[in-house]
């Protein structure tokens, strides 16, 4: 089961990532990939694009949850037909 602390961490992770400035040097070693410190070719995302990405992510997540719900729910067993004649069951035929 997922703990509330993990959900809170996942919700606050984008906020922490947004607080960092592009090109900021990290405390990782220089040989670590992606720590050059430059942000050439990086651009800020426009607000409508960012809102669209968040909305698309939410819709995709809801579709996945719906598909899992439909596939994982218990199936109904077919109704028994009492009109059948059973040889070894007295009183039913």
From Swiss-Prot:
It is found in: Membrane. Phosphorylated; PIK3R1 and GRB2 associate specifically with tyrosine-phosphorylated HCST. One of its GO terms (biological process) is regulation of immune response. It is a single-pass type I membrane protein. The keyword Plastid does not apply. The keyword Transmembrane applies. Predominantly expressed in hemopoietic cells such as NK cells, subset of T-cells and monocytes. Detected in leukocytes, spleen, and thymus. Residues 19-48 are extracellular. Keywords: Disulfide bond, Glycoprotein, Membrane, Phosphoprotein, Signal, Transmembrane, Transmembrane helix. Silencing of HCST suppresses cytolytic activity of T-cells and NK cells. This is Hematopoietic cell signal transducer. It comes from Homo sapiens (Human). The gene is HCST.
């Amino acid at each position: 089961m997922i703990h509330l602390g993990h959900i809170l961490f996942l919700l606050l992770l984008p906020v922490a990532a947004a607080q960092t400035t592009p090109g900021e040097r990290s405390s990782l070693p220089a040989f670590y990939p992606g720590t050059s410190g430059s942000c050439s070719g990086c651009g800020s995302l426009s607000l409508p694009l960012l809102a669209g990405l968040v909305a698309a992510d939410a819709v995709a997540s809801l579709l996945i949850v719906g598909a899992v719900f439909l596939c994982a729910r218990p199936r109904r067993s077919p109704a028994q037909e009492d009109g059948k004649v059973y040889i070894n069951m007295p009183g039913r035929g």
